[in-house]
């Protein structure tokens, strides 16, 4: 996974300490050419949301030519699981679950628990696909997904296979 050392590379990562040195080594990217956007789960939940906006600004203002969406292998957001168990949240979650299940446009189906604790491999694949097919992302920008696996004490990196959906927006946006 050799990256041209003179070009800017954007990493959308999970909020986890210690990923930058691992990614620099794995992608052969120097610190001065590395830009990082951190979010819980390294996910882009909406094609016109704040994280996607930051990605687009990075592409045009920093001349980013390659983007890596980086997740931690099979990690689930433990904080999300804790939120759904709080007694003070139960009424709010019940209301939101109703909205999720009745597919209001701003909610993409499922439950609050599924939304908060989405599988990291699915999240990374969807985010990569959303960036690749976004109308404001130039075709020359390479977008790849990576998983960092910390099993065995030594981190390993695996590339996410390409998703073949070709659809970056939810179905309700296409009708």
UniProtKB/Swiss-Prot annotation:
A single GO molecular function term of this UniProt record: carbonate dehydratase activity
Xref: InterPro entries: Carbonic_anhydrase, Carbonic_anhydrase_sf
Top-rank taxon: Bacteria
UniProt family annotation: Belongs to the beta-class carbonic anhydrase family.
Record PANTHER family: CARBONIC ANHYDRASE, CARBONIC ANHYDRASE-LIKE PROTEIN YBCF-RELATED
Official protein name in the record: Putative carbonic anhydrase-like protein YbcF
Species, as recorded: Bacillus subtilis (strain 168)
């Amino acid at each position: 996974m050799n990256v041209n050392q003179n070009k800017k590379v954007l990493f959308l990562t999970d909020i986890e300490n210690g990923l930058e040195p691992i990614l620099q080594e794995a992608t052969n990217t120097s610190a001065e050419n590395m830009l990082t956007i951190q979010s819980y789960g390294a996910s882009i939940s909406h094609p016109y949301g704040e994280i996607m906006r930051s990605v687009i600004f990075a592409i045009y203002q920093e001349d980013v030519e390659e983007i890596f969406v980086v997740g931690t292998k099979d990690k689930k957001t433990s904080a999300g699981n804790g939120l759904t168990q709080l007694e003070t949240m139960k009424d709010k979650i019940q209301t939101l679950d109703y909205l999720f299940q009745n597919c209001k446009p701003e909610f993409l189906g499922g439950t609050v628990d599924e939304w908060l604790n989405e599988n990291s491999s699915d999240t990374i694949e969807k985010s990569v696909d959303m960036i690749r097919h976004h109308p404001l992302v130039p075709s020359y920008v390479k977008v790849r997904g990576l998983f960092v696996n910390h099993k065995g004490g030594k981190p390993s990196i695996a590339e996410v296979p390409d998703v073949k959906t070709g659809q970056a927006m939810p179905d309700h946006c296409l009708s």
